[in-house]
Design a protein with these regions (language model features):
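Acidic, low-complexity, intrinsically disordered interaction modules
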Residues: 87, 137-138, 143, 258-259, ...
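Surface-exposed loop/turn elements that mediate protein-protein interactions on large endomembrane-trafficking
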Residues: 29-49, 53-79, 108-125, 155-175, ...
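Sec-dependent signal peptide cleavage junction
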Residues: 15-31
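Positively charged n-region of N-terminal signal peptides that target proteins for export
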Residues: 1-7
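Repeated scaffold domains used in trafficking and secretory/extracellular systems
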Residues: 35-46, 80-90, 129-141, 178-188, ...
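Repetitive helical segments and hydrophobic/amphipathic motifs
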Residues: 11-12
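Residue position within the beta-strands of beta-propeller blades
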Residues: 45, 52-53, 95-97, 144-148, ...
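Short, conserved, GDST-rich strand-edge loop motifs in beta-rich repeat architectures
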Residues: 99-104, 150-156
Length: 372
């Protein structure tokens, strides 16, 4: 036994990533379409309303995107040390991971709550003193998938233990040893990570090569080793969206997607495509510089924070040489127009969809004050 452990340890040390399946008891389950996982500051819009959480507001449910909301859970927000670490909706329940401070330690809890704010239930909990981090990854039927991150001194790597809580039973699915595992996603009954796909129905793994993965409610987009942007739907149909992609920016949770390529001058050019429709050129980054009366030298002094579909236009939240703008362009291409510019150069813009409306606000990074 000791010899076997010694051999296993040497293999782990020799490879940057090792996948260790440990046990599987997950029977086949229907994956509900709306088990899209939002990040800690993301806004989740779905058929029954909107759920929000960020450093400045409550974890709340707005029915039909109205002004009145129901608080789902409470937490303090001292610079982000507490908060929501992933959440999703299944039926009338919200599944979420919450981090709270308790007795000089932090407690991670995987919980559920009804949309009316009642019937809170703790599925799983662990203290931070025992692990480094917990993140909710997604759902599988009535089960919640998450990982626990710990540091393994023997192999000098982080260990990500992926677990499933379902039918009042906790199952360890597999472990991943990695320096930094940042791209792990759940889509259509499979967990995608480190060029592997783990099938939750049978516990089998297959190779799935992707440099980057982006999950929406109905599609998974990924960039393969040839820099082709591809999509995968819930019938496991794959198609090439475009070749030689530079960056993926966003999707409307359907088959419409925003991305960019580099032209012969190494200038970023933005595109939009819907399904098998033709590819539309939106504009180039130099066009956005012209619209904002900012000098463009060809050197990268800009950053696209987000790109959203709204009313047949694409809205870019962009930083140009330290100034922040919202610039829009028609979905079939046009000259970009400035929609909004911050009143203070030190402020940045938070842009998001709330229900069916585009919302934005100025944020002061020094005092966390928001001007709506």
């Amino acid at each position: 036994m000791k010899k076997l452990l010694s051999i296993l340890l040497s293999v782990i040390m020799a490879m940057s990533v090792i996948i260790i399946p440990t046990s599987v008891s997950a029977k086949k389950a229907k994956t509900v379409p709306n088990t899209y996982v939002a990040t800690y500051d993301d806004i989740l819009n779905f058929s029954k309303g909107t759920i929000t959480t960020d450093f400045w507001g409550p974890f709340a449910y707005y029915k039909n995107s109205g002004n009145k909301y129901i608080t789902l859970d409470k937490y303090d927000t001292p610079y982000g040390y507490e908060g929501i670490l992933g959440y999703y909706v299944r039926g009338d329940k919200v599944y979420y991971c919450i981090k709270k401070e308790i007795f000089n330690d932090y407690l991670y809890q995987i919980k559920t709550v009804d949309l009316n704010g009642k019937n809170k239930k703790v599925l799983y909990k662990v203290k931070e003193s025992k692990i480094s981090n917990v993140l909710l990854l997604g759902g599988y039927g009535s089960g919640a998938i998450f990982y626990e991150k710990t540091y393994n001194k023997k192999v000098n790597k982080f260990c990500y233990t992926v677990k499933l809580f379902r039918n009042n039973k906790l199952t360890t699915l597999f472990k991943v040893y990695s320096d930094n595992l940042t791209n792990i996603n759940v889509f259509n009954g499979k967990i995608y990570y480190q060029n592997e796909a783990y099938n939750l129905a049978n516990g089998k793994k297959t190779t799935f090569t992707a440099k980057e993965i982006y999950v929406t409610k109905n599609y998974m987009y990924y960039i393969n080793k040839n820099n082709n942007l591809k999509s995968l739907d819930k019938k496991d149909v794959r198609r090439i969206v475009t070749k030689n992609v530079y960056k993926y920016y966003n999707s409307n949770n359907g088959s419409s997607v925003i991305y960019s390529k580099l032209n012969s001058k190494k200038e970023e050019v933005f595109y939009k495509r819907t399904g098998t429709d033709k590819e539309y050129k939106l504009c180039a980054i130099s066009d956005i510089y012209k619209a904002t009366n900012t000098s463009y030298t060809g050197k990268k002094h800009y950053w696209i924070n987000d790109a959203l579909f709204y009313n047949n236009k694409v809205y870019f939240n962009i930083s140009l040489d330290g100034s922040y703008y919202i610039v829009n362009v028609k979905t079939r291409g046009s000259k970009p127009s400035v929609f909004f510019k911050t009143t203070n150069k030190d402020y940045y813009i938070d842009m998001y969809m709330f229900g069916n409306k585009l919302e934005y606000r100025e944020c002061d990074p020094n005092s966390y004050i928001i001007d709506d």
